[in-house]
Amino acid sequence: MSNPLRVGVGGPVGSGKTALLEWLCREMQQHYSVAAITNDIYTKEDQRILTASGALPAERIMGVETGGCPHTAIREDASMNLAAVEDMQLRFADLELIFIESGGDNLAATFSPELADLTLYVIDVAAGEKIPRKGGPGITRSDLLVINKTDLAPLVGADLAVMEQDTLRMRGSRPFVFTNLKQGDGVAAIIQFLVEKGGLGV
């Protein structure tokens, strides 16, 4: 059975997790054997979106209905997701990379180390420039912080320079990237991070 790199993708509802997953799956499947697991509380809507967008073949996308608190399924009791990962590994012997998208959650959500090797945490500019300084494990401890929707900064009165300063202060040396996932801005930097930090040979 393969031992793929497992990448957790977290962040609040509407921050752009599924949009990021679409980009990463579409781009990275050209070089790697990729699968994705999505978590929704009561539906498999994110699985449907990913499938409809053509980001990956349908058989490489699995939806997990978590019920209750979405962070429990990625942290305290990750059994459903671990079972889904194992299912994908059995399905695709050559699997090199698997994305696990959490259900929309708050800033305190984190992935269990047994579930994810690397974590990406997505926040968005439209939620206000104060978001980075609010902290929380997703912002301070994720392997890569993705600050999405930079195009909306002028519309919501957010100063990206202030967000950058706050992020540097909250994260220290941990990396972050600004993105506009509508256009794909910043996606290349995220892929480069995953390849380098995840030890993926091109």
UniProtKB/Swiss-Prot annotation:
Lineage, opening ranks: Bacteria, Pseudomonadati, Pseudomonadota, Alphaproteobacteria, Magnetococcales
Family: Belongs to the SIMIBI class G3E GTPase family. UreG subfamily.
InterPro entries: CobW/HypB/UreG_nucleotide-bd, P-loop_NTPase, UreG
Subcellular location, record wording: Cytoplasm
Presence of the UniProt keyword Nuclease in the record: no
Keyword list, A-Z: Chaperone, Cytoplasm, GTP-binding, Nickel insertion, Nucleotide-binding
CDD domains, per database record: UreG
Entry GO MF terms: GTP binding; GTPase activity; nickel cation binding
UniProt-annotated binding residues for GTP: G11, P12, V13, G14, S15, G16, K17, T18
Protein name, as recorded: Urease accessory protein UreG
Organism listed in the record: Magnetococcus marinus (strain ATCC BAA-1437 / JCM 17883 / MC-1)
Subcellular location, principal: cytoplasm
Annotated GO CC locations: cytoplasm
GO biological process, one term: urea catabolic process
Complexes and interactors: Homodimer. UreD, UreF and UreG form a complex that acts as a GTP-hydrolysis-dependent molecular chaperone, activating the urease apoprotein by helping to assemble the nickel containing metallocenter of UreC. The UreE protein probably delivers the nickel.
Purpose of the protein: Facilitates the functional incorporation of the urease nickel metallocenter. This process requires GTP hydrolysis, probably effectuated by UreG.
